[in-house]
């Protein structure tokens, strides 16, 4: 192939042949070649004299003639923005297709890519619809003048490539172009050198300037920057100017020592008295009115939470050294919202050059929000708060495999038991940084994480580094996971020549904007996040009930509860440590956000990693605990306590979710892709019988809730013997054939049984009826005579039709007729008294009206009448 291309290049070269080479066709060209402008025959030109402009699809990189697009059918012409089409036709007429209107295009997509993006068969549709865009909001007069100028052809015969065979890509720069696929391309450096040597400066190719168009940043959807930043910064700076209201949150600060799992589970059962102060209720974290928890330095700071941070003189260069200078990290350009990968060393050097100690600060504002540091030297200097470690699903339920010579999965599961029990024994005490209690257990867990040879969700340790002016748009953390967030204290200038990330005495803060996760607000967020247009031009605060603002300073720590919608503004350079965690106190919201992510087509790689698999681990562990809770212990001196009622309520949601997942596996009408997806996310090494585990968990949870009086008696009265017919969670009972089907049918009836109403034996008192005698009134009226045919009666002719209507569509004269109206009223009433003295009276009233109109041949002489008694007899209606 390379030899053929080289031969063609030699033959086509003007140096070799002295003849013109026909232009390269595009996929839309006709068999006769590219389209010719109307003036080509008048001026005596040929097709080889025309410089065809090329445009590439931003999705598939396929190249097309701009003229072929403009002159194509509606499918292809419709890919061009309408404003461009109207401007070209208005200013250039028939010659417009050959003008350089491509210069006005920002992003463009070909028809096949547009069709595929909306096709139901596309397994991975785009997050937002593909739409062609323009460089500017409107086309300026200078743009029109520039587009009408002809592209000059080089007069030099030493040009290495014919200009007619050169594509002008949408990202090409002046003096650099990309040859067509049929020409053997030299290296970029050689081509630039030859172009400089052989092409006059005045004849240099006029390509489009290179630019990076603003795009949605999917790499960091958890903290995405998906909208134009500048307008939101202006809005939050002066909300009143734009007619908006942002309230101060004024969330009360809490003492750090209070935040433990024991505090979360100190809420008594509904209806029972509580001795907890209203400001310290644990429902502030997991209740319907939950709100962010803030711990200030005066309340004990991060250390009082049982956490640990690096020393205060930590710099970005230190972060790079501890994590690895060559570690790649996603760096977000806040202004263009474009994400690119840098090494940490490059990031540290950029921050150093942008420090307040330098004379000139870099104008570009960047943000790093996705640096996960697990398994690094920096991770050894960071410990999450105790409450996070106590309730985090990953730490407490994930099955880590240590590999050869290490603990197996079952031993890790027993390690969970011992770790949790030891934490429960110490729940009344607080661990300071110097305490070693429980240290061996935590070290074992960290050792398992380091030695594991299987992936696990690494979301608990993040280092975030933001420059002044950074903005993180509205988002809910993946799977509605909770977040702990602490601002590292300001660094001092080192004695060495290195310039610190922070200038001395700088004021470090973060401003959070919160929207409460109510049902309506979550619906509004789902609508906003699922619409590219609304993310671009709609302030989410306009779609929700209210927006509240919280400002954090260096040393402050905040724990954001499940499902909170929030945005973040960084007014000063900052280093932040934080992480995400799932827990058992808001499972319903976590599952709800999982569904929102599916509905809004969030790519799987931007959701909580291995979420479904983690749910199965949680279900297996809790089901085992509930099974042991009811086990007979002949030598036991104490009785184990069931999980907190809030945990049981949330486990009910989890069980229903897992039952629905197994339902997909059992559904023969479900798509194979959906069934395989569910199957692959079940940890088969632990969960041998997914359906049995899900239903057993549902049954055991409902039994415990019933014992606490939080469920109907029927729901908690399912006998264990009935459940055992389906086997244990490990599938120890194996039954084949019809017996399995028969027992499953019986089980489904048990679990699908509806609770009987508490008023099933209630007999209300009888009604006392009062029926009035019919009231009959006869009057003489003037109405047109209706048609007696059935078709006309159906079409509306008759007394109810418009006056003057007749069978033939004409107008009849009014005739005298007799109208008889009968009115019947019936009322009934009943009254009962409850045990507490409440009296309830119910009444009903029914009115029946019947009308009859009679036309006669001689109404003016002979009155058509009927004895009143007979009419009443015929019309009497028995209710």
Curated annotation (Swiss-Prot):
Its cofactor is Fe(2+). Residues 183-192, 407-433, 848-864 have a biased composition (Basic and acidic residues). The keyword Zinc applies. SMART domains: JmjC, PHD. Fe cation binds at residues 475, 477, 566. Residues 769-782 have a biased composition (Polar residues). Substrate binds at residues 472, 492. It catalyses: N(6),N(6)-dimethyl-L-lysyl(36)-[histone H3] + 2 2-oxoglutarate + 2 O2 = L-lysyl(36)-[histone H3] + 2 formaldehyde + 2 succinate + 2 CO2. The JmjC domain mediates the demethylation activity. This is JmjC domain-containing histone demethylation protein 1. It comes from Cryptococcus neoformans var. neoformans serotype D (strain B-3501A).
